[in-house]
């Protein structure tokens, strides 16, 4: 399939699917090379703990996903292999990290600002029997 040549070993109907697979494998290879080009310690030093957790989880998920694909290519049903439970466990941790990230992004209440906003937003109608501004300083005694 390299160089766009047609191979007679498989039906023509699956040519597009095989080409897409080959392209995807190339993309995965490129990403892994990029990821492996920087030492893990060097990468993690630049990140805060939450980002470090994300990198570790994505790395573990990627590795286990690739093992899932490997098992499938070897004729082993990955759904019946312990790798399935491992992927589910990693997903649980990914969801926890996502919840933490979402909580950090959520709007926080500034009580002082909210109090000022409510106080200034309330409208008080003028009473009919209130003295004029000119009479404000004078008393009726």
Curated annotation (Swiss-Prot):
Residues 50-100 are annotated as: Interaction with NR1D1. One of its GO terms (molecular function) is RNA binding. Phosphorylated by PRKDC. InterPro entries: Exosome-assoc_fac/DNA_repair, Sas10/Utp3/C1D. Keywords: Apoptosis, Cytoplasm, DNA-binding, Isopeptide bond, Nucleus, Phosphoprotein, Repressor, RNA-binding, rRNA processing, Transcription, Transcription regulation, Ubl conjugation. The keyword Transmembrane helix does not apply. Pfam families: Sas10_Utp3. Residues 100-141 are annotated as: Interaction with NCOR1 and NCOR2. Residues 1-100 are annotated as: Required for transcriptional repression. There is a cross-link at residues 119, 126 (Glycyl lysine isopeptide (Lys-Gly) (interchain with G-Cter in SUMO2)). It is found in: Nucleus; Cytoplasm; Nucleus, Nucleolus. GO terms for biological process: apoptotic process; maturation of 5.8S rRNA; regulation of gene expression. Its main location: nucleus. The keyword DNA-binding applies. Plays a role in the recruitment of the RNA exosome complex to pre-rRNA to mediate the 3'-5' end processing of the 5.8S rRNA; this function may include MPHOSPH6. Can activate PRKDC not only in the presence of linear DNA but also in the presence of supercoiled DNA. Can induce apoptosis in a p53/TP53 dependent manner. May regulate the TRAX/TSN complex formation. Potentiates transcriptional repression by NR1D1 and THRB. Monomer and homodimer. Interacts with NR1D1, THRA, THRB, NCOR1 and NCOR2. Associates with the RNA exosome complex. Interacts with EXOSC10; the interaction probably mediates the association with the nuclear form of the RNA exosome. The homodimeric form interacts with TSNAX following gamma-radiation. Interacts with RAC3. Associates with the RNA exosome complex. Belongs to the C1D family. This is Nuclear nucleic acid-binding protein C1D. The gene is C1D.
């Amino acid at each position: 399939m390299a160089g766009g040549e047609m191979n007679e070993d498989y039906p023509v109907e699956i040519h597009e699917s095989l080409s897409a697979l080959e392209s995807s494998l190339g993309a995965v290879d490129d990403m892994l090379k990029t990821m492996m080009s920087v030492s893990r310690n060097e990468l993690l030093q630049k990140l805060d703990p939450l980002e470090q957790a994300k990198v570790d989880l994505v790395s573990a998920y990627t590795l286990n996903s690739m093992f899932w694909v490997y098992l499938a290519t070897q004729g082993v049903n990955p759904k019946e292999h312990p790798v399935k439970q491992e992927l589910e466990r990693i997903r649980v941790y990914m969801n926890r990290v996502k919840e933490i990230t979402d909580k950090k992004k959520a709007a926080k209440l500034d009580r002082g600002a909210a109090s000022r906003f409510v106080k200034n937003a309330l409208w008080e109608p003028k009473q009919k029997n209130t003295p004029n501004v000119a009479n404000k300083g004078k008393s009726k005694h």
